[in-house]
């Protein structure tokens, strides 16, 4: 799986959320759920999982053969609930 992102957006995300897109790749290597995003006209997805003991959400889209990361942040309450519904943790 190949990952890509806009470098300026990566830096902005790091300043805003304290999370680096480089680390977001790890979210796809751990148990996670994927749900469609309803907040954009572009087809986007949320990967919700647990990294280093905390819930994180990666907002991304698929472009050709790559996953393009748009945002990486702590999960919101409703996102954590969706994860719990599936994994029961």
Regions found by a protein language model. Name each.
Residues 1-89:
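Ribonuclease/tRNase effector modules and their secretory precursors
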